Amino acid sequence: MAQQPDTEPGMAELRAARRDHHGLLWSVGLFSVFVNLLQLTGPLYMLQIYDRVLASRSEETLVALSLLTACLFLAMAVLDHARARVLARIGAAIQGRLDARVFSAALHRRLLHPSDPTTATAQRDLESVQRLYASPLLTALFDMLWTPVFAAAIFLFHPALGWLAVAGGAVLIAATLLNQRLTQAPQNRAITLGQQADQVSDQIRAESETVLALGMTGAAFARWQALRATALADSLTAADLAGTFGSAIKTFRLFLQSAMLGLGAWLVLQGQISGGVMVAASILMGRALAPVELAMSQWATALRAQEGMQRLALLLSRHPPPPPRLTLPHPKAVVEVQNLTVTAPESAQAVLRMISFTLHPGQALGVIGPSGAGKSSLARALIGVWPPAAGKVRLDGATLDQYDPDALGSYIGYLPQRVALFDGTIAENIARLALCPDSAKVVQAAQRAAAHDMILRLPDGYDTRVSALGGRLSGGQIQRIGLARALYGDPVLLVLDEPNSNLDN
């Protein structure tokens, strides 16, 4: 039997993020106490109308009760709005705390394990948790805690009315649990297949030039459509089940209120309760069962959040937070490679074995070999994105993992075999996505890459906006901008993977 992955470390991180807001959750609970106590306003108002106002025919009493009731309902609305706002901000705060952690974990995990599905949906999974807090579901769960209290209040009116409310509530809760059990599997399958279809669609759009040029549109659509159709079928199955249960629960709740009125009317005829009690019991039962119906309508949100939390816990467990590192001094660029062995991600076979060399400042090393010989693998090991399977890569005596990753990145210039630009201006791309690029450093890097004059000829120069696919730029122009990005900040170690590809002469 396959061993289940350990998600406890990641789940502990998620619980810690939520634990920071326990005080606010307690305040939501306190608001819920007053909101649900104020839910008794309607039944008590009806009791007073039937048993006091109509009996005394006092207009003054009616006006006073109506004004008091309006004030109480206004207070309930304010408190209900306040707790919804607090819950929404708790969700936003949890997302804000975990955003950087999840982003970094997904980035590093995807580098070493490209096929891991948790990396493709990490940010959306975190958003699903945030949406759970912003949805009406959590307020409904707080209100469901008061369902037994309302049922007990109905018992005070008359035991027969109380037992009817308890029996009806039990049926609704059982239907809700059965709905959750039956819809969870198709809903999960629909989510998984939908994510796979989205990945295929993104890949097809990214390679649209090749797809159109080689007449692959039909085949590409068929691959996407196969996944999409299966996901849609499972989604419809889950929606049909949820719709059936939702309609049944809504209809049954309306029937229960009518049954409560019918039973109450019979008890009135027997002289055991008053007309006010009959109406108040019906209203109170509606208040007691409304959270169950609301939770039922929002159950899909809960399922998405639950699945998202499981995937996030798995991702965070597989990529724990890095330990704190001592800030090392700026290196002088002495590179030592000692018996280096490199394996590709998700592979146990070594691409390079027992490589050793030393480079001092000012020295260069060219690596020549056929395709698949491991040149790019060596480059990735030298910049630290592929950890060595054996041996060491040292920069000024320290292994690369002893440096802070962001600090190490500023010391290194890297031009990959396939250069990619990011959405933004050319200056921002050269400045490695800095929000406020250093103009002098940007121009200096472009001049060193022989890209300055080419950039000035573009419509907006360094402020020309480009897309992730390059847009109007040729392969050679993208290559030169990538080289300028590698040279930005005067790095101490420059690693270039086929730097002259796409360049004329």
Name the predicted role of every residue range.
Residues 15, 19-23, 111-112, 125-133, ...:
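An intracellular "coupling" helix at the cytosolic face of ABC transporter transmembrane type-1 domains
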Residues 394, 427-468:
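ABC ATPase nucleotide-binding domain helical subdomain, centered on the C-loop/LSGGQ "ABC signature"
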Residues 32, 65-72, 139-189, 262-273, ...:
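Transmembrane helices of ABC transporter permease
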Residues 88, 216, 240, 288-315:
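Cytosolic ends of transmembrane helices, especially the final helix of ABC transmembrane type-1 domains
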Residues 68-80, 168-171, 242, 246-253, ...:
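Hydrophobic alpha-helical segments in the permease module
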Residues 25-82, 86, 155-160, 271-275:
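Transmembrane helix-loop-helix hairpins at lipid-water interfaces of multipass membrane proteins
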Residues 383:
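Helix-to-loop junction immediately C-terminal to a conserved catalytic motif
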